[in-house]
């Protein structure tokens, strides 16, 4: 479970990134997090991964309390959270298999575990036939799938996807979201940070809207008053995405 209660985060310059943010995400939920640039979304992600602590308020992530967490416990917290970065952060000199295996070696997994787990995860994301390829030989959609595999390989209880469809065409975007839905169906909590209004509407999940460091809306749909401010221009054609959904 992820729980923020009256969370304030003040940076050294005196700017507040969060101003009393309160939200709770239960185990196994699929949630969209939306908001304009500078609203506090990145700060929330950094707190969930243990990179930042709150100035005041409480943050609980998968059994860990950020106010009381010890430095040596942070790596264990991070093992419960897999992050799919917007820029992928893949290692071009490594193969697909090696990119995913590297994420397991970093946390001390045994080679036997790696040989069993990596092929399973690559099959889950549809890259089992591309194990020997390098990231720079792959399409954007395939690179995104590889980034998801790497985030998933250590079996985290939570996946955070930061703008996972930002550089993809409508068809590839829908495929990536369908993959995240499949991962969620296996019991993993999924938090998707996005500006894509059409994806949010089509997948019809819980939406948490943040603005100026506070949660201003938390529901199964985006209130009309918020839509214009919190989304980019209509990047996807509604007809294209509807066809893909069918």
Which residues make up each language-model segment?
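Short coil-to-helix segment of the ABC ATPase nucleotide-binding domain corresponding to the Q-loop/switch region
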Residues: 94-102
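Helix-to-loop junction immediately C-terminal to a conserved catalytic motif
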Residues: 49
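Conserved ABC ATPase signature
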Residues: 134-138, 142-144
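Conserved ABC transporter NBD signature motif
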Residues: 57-65
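Catalytic Walker B motif of ABC-type/P-loop ATPase nucleotide-binding domains
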Residues: 159-162
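Helix N-cap at the start of a conserved alpha-helix in ABC-type nucleotide-binding domains
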Residues: 170-172
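A short, proline-enriched helix->beta-strand linker immediately N-terminal to the Walker B motif
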Residues: 153-157
């Amino acid at each position: 479970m992820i729980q923020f209660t009256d969370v304030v985060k003040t940076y050294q310059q005196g700017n507040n990134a969060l101003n009393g943010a309160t939200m709770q995400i239960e185990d196994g939920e699929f949630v969209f997090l939306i908001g304009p640039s500078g609203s506090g979304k990145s700060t929330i992600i950094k707190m969930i991964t243990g990179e930042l602590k709150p100035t005041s308020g409480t943050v609980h992530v998968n059994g860990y309390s950020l106010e009381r967490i010890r430095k040596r416990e942070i790596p264990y917290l991070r093992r419960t959270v897999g992050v799919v970065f917007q820029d992928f952060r893949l290692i071009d000199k490594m193969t697909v298999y090696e990119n995913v295996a590297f994420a397991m070696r970093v946390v001390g997994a045994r080679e036997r575990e790696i040989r069993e787990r990596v092929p399973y995860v690559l099959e889950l994301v549809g890259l089992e036939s591309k194990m020997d390829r390098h990231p720079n030989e792959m399409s954007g959609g395939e690179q995104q799938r590889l980034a998801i595999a790497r985030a998933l390989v250590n079996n985290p209880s939570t996946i955070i996807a930061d703008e996972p469809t930002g550089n993809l065409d409508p068809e590839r975007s829908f495929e990536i979201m369908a993959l995240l839905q499949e991962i969620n169906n296996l019991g993993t909590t999924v938090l998707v940070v996005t500006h894509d209004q059409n994806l949010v509407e089509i997948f019809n999940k819980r939406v948490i809207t943040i603005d100026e460091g506070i949660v201003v809306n938390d529901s199964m749909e985006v209130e009309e008053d918020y839509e214009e401010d919190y989304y980019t221009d209509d990047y996807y054609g509604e007809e294209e995405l509807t066809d893909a959904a069918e």
